[in-house]
Amino acid sequence: MKLNNIVEVKATLVLKTGLHIGSGDSEMHIGGIDNAVIKNPITQKPYIPGSSLKGKIRSLLEWRSGEVKEKPLSISDIKGSNAEMVKNILRLFGVSADSNKDEPVVKEIGVARLGFQDCEFTSDWEQYLEENNLSATEAKFENTIDRITSTAGNPRQTERIPAGAKFDFKLTLRQFENDSENLIDLLLKGLRLLELDSLGGSGSRGYGKVEFQNLTVGDKAVNLKEINPFA
């Protein structure tokens, strides 16, 4: 495979509602947050892991393909009327590590084209927080409602990055000889699906609505609102 180009996809990722991506911290603090967001261990600033973006976008595209399984799609799922879309998903996100590298279809698909990066706060958002003496996160109080008595119980605090926060979004797309433009189209559909769905935890409760602003693919501006992921 001959590498012909590496395209940068950039945008400002804006939170339309609060975002919670957990840190996995099992340490308990009396009076503290029950569910903390992931933070940079050095700066203690929250960020969006590239792995979270990659996993959610891939999952949405797999659902769109109609071939979704309990595990990520693999070589064995390339069949039927959606075979080419499954191939393109594997081209973008990669095949599993246990795939037979000598199998012809694995060689045809090649290496993963996408490279996701962690998203940090934009400089202007950091400046806004500093100038207004605002916290980078908020505590969202939630309860479980007793269906019989209608009383609230089991109170808990979930840490969120508040609506309005802005992040620098960037990924790279490796373009190899004979790669189809359909790969870029599929990626854009994945980004649009993410806008229509949610990122992180508690999406069914309104968390994690995001929007990609000032999106560019290489030197070309793209309006995701014009992308129909179901076409």
PLM features per residue range, with description:
Residues 1-140, 154-231:
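RNA-binding basic/glycine-rich loop and surface signature characteristic of RAMP-family CRISPR effectors
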